[in-house]
Design a protein with these regions (language model features):
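His/Asp/Glu-rich metal-coordinating catalytic cores
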Residues: 1-65, 70-262, 266-273, 277-281, ...
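C-terminal regulatory/interaction regions
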Residues: 11, 269, 273-275, 304-418
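Short Asp/Glu-rich motifs
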Residues: 96, 264, 290, 393, ...
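Positively charged, amphipathic N-terminal segments that serve as targeting/anchoring signals
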Residues: 280-317
């Protein structure tokens, strides 16, 4: 068995790991590079890079496995012709995302046709976006999946030639993340993907490792937080901090990810405790919340059950009187601006609940200035966030628990070490 880290030893995100035998090979993640990893590649450059990696060292049996649905882990799927595997929940999240985008492009095309005076160039761009997104949906539909294993049940391995890959559910800042046990040639590799212990679902991390991550030859672990001094508070503490500031302001906006089930739960609990109606105005967030509720409500004793108000202008007067907690994303900037113009700024707060690098890091801002611009719309802003990644103490404990013969650290900044 051989391991090759194509990308990830000295960068966060964009990871590509290859594990092979004489007759078979699997890739774990084919992630899109993040802005902090240098100049963004063009689609043509990504196509060539993926083709070169796959063409070199081809085997009779081959497949790609994805740990979760963040773009820096799954973003290059569009260029891959091999069989691709992902968790059932992750596949559904990606389909929700691209189907919602497809509807948006469809509406834009219809509006252009109705106006009959829109620019030809813009119309062609929207039609190209529509075709591309439709192709991505078709490609995603072909993904093979595994179902998350019920508590107290052992997950089933997936066989690719003489390699066995077994997925294990883990806690991360997106729904349906997994670790992998890869077995072949009498060797056992444990690939962690992205993980943490300080989320609601993180308590299962070490019981799982003690039970399944035994006799491991090589541990491949993420190291995102190795050079960072951020304190990783628990999601419960995130919720308590949010509840406290929600008590102090009448109108509260919370900038958070629509795919982070645990953060959405923290916001929901904070809003309930502060006696504020939970609102959203994103169709994508509405659909992810419905999906989470359908899949996880009963399993979580209601923690992951969501029933937000979908904001419309008809609700404005009622919410103006009562106040609200509204979960938002940067794609809703224009609608938020309209609403902010109607609200007293001294009673309005933004809880920024995302990584602060999106507005502090110059490379990130250059690549996507929306987070910084979104913050600047508000007079009152407070950061309440915790990482989706394991802190140094958790990484150390994982290594001590697994006790592998060798450790490879990926998904880490250049110069970071164990």
């Amino acid at each position: 068995m051989e391991i090759k880290i194509h990308r990830g030893l000295d960068q966060i995100g964009g990871c590509i790991t290859e594990i092979c035998t004489d007759s078979s090979r699997v890739f774990i993640d084919f992630g899109q590079n993040q802005p902090s990893n240098g100049k963004a590649a063009t689609p043509e450059e990504d196509t060539l890079m993926v083709a070169d990696i796959i063409r070199n060292n081809e085997k009779e049996h081959q497949a790609v496995f994805y740990t979760h649905a963040h773009e820096d882990h799954v973003g290059l799927f569009r260029y891959i012709l091999l069989e691709q595997y992902i968790g059932e929940g992750s596949k559904e999240l990606l389909l929700i995302k691209y189907r919602t985008l497809l509807e948006r492009y469809e509406m834009a095309i219809d509006e252009n046709h109705q106006l009959q005076e829109g620019s030809k160039e813009n119309e062609e761009l929207q039609e190209e976006n529509y075709r591309t997104t439709k192709d991505l949906i078709d490609k995603l539909k072909a993904f093979k999946t595994w179902k998350r294993t019920a508590l107290k049940e052992s997950p089933s391995p997936i066989t690719i030639g003489d390699i066995r890959v077994t997925p294990f559910f883990t806690c991360h800042s997106i729904y349906d993340a997994h670790m992998f046990l890869v077995e072949a040639d009498g060797k056992r590799i444990w690939h962690t993907g992205d993980y943490r212990q300080h989320g609601y679902m993180g308590k299962a991390l070490f019981p799982m490792l003690r039970r399944y991550a035994t006799n491991i030859d090589v541990l491949i672990t993420e190291g995102t937080m190795l050079k960072r001094k951020d304190k990783c508070i628990h999601e419960c503490e995130v919720s308590r901090k949010m509840e406290s500031v929600m008590q102090a302001f009448k109108y509260v906006f919370v900038l958070a990810s629509a795919t982070d089930i645990e953060r959405l739960a923290s916001i929901k609990v904070a809003a309930e405790t502060a006696n504020k109606p939970l609102c959203i105005l994103s169709l994508f967030m509405k659909r992810t919340m419905e999906f989470f509720t359908e899949r996880q409500s009963s399993l979580s004793r209601g923690l992951f059950s969501f029933a937000p108000l979908f904001y419309t202008d008809k609700l404005y007067r009622k919410l103006k009187r009562r106040g609200f907690a509204m979960v938002v994303g940067t794609s809703q900037t224009d609608r938020i601006k309209e609403l902010l113009d109607k609200l007293p700024q001294e009673e309005t707060l933004l809880i920024y609940s995302s990584w602060d690098g999106y507005y502090k890091n110059a490379e990130q801002v250059k690549a996507n200035s929306k987070y910084k611009e979104f913050r600047e719309m508000f007079h009152n802003v407070v950061d309440i966030h915790t990482s989706g990644h394991a802190d140094k103490a958790t990484i150390r404990k994982v290594i001590e628990t697994v006790c592998p013969k060798e450790v490879i650290c990926i998904h880490k900044e250049a110069g970071a070490s164990l």
